[in-house]
């Protein structure tokens, strides 16, 4: 029972301290993520878990993870950010 109470406390604290997001509230370099609570999350860097751009819910938020930073792509084989090898340099 104590573990459950601690878990609830942590979730409430996380939702209190996380920047709540909605229409255009998240700043540059972030996206709005719905899980575990609706909050702004940083865009993915190399090897972070990611969602592809445009894979949002009906509310326009990303379900679990943000897309990758500019210059990276979300590899659908393992859902992580990788260097975009299609860029011409």
UniProtKB/Swiss-Prot annotation:
Residues 1-18 form the signal peptide. Expressed by the venom gland. Keywords: Disulfide bond, Secreted, Signal. Disulfide bonds join 21-32, 26-40, 31-66, 50-74, 68-81. It comes from the Eukaryota. Its main location: secreted. Residues 87-89 form a propeptide. The keyword Signal applies. It is found in: Secreted. One of its GO terms (cellular component) is extracellular region. Belongs to the MIT-like AcTx family. This is U1-hexatoxin-Iw1e. It comes from Illawarra wisharti.
């Amino acid at each position: 029972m104590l573990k459950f109470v601690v878990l609830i406390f942590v979730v409430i604290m996380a939702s209190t301290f996380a920047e709540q997001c909605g229409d255009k509230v998240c700043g540059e370099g972030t996206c709005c993520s719905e899980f575990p609570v609706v909050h702004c999350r940083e865009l993915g860097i190399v090897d972070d878990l990611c969602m592809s751009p445009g894979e949002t819910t009906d509310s326009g938020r990303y379900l679990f993870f943000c897309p990758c930073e500019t210059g990276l792509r979300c590899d659908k084989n393992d859902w992580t950010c990788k260097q975009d090898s299609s860029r011409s340099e």
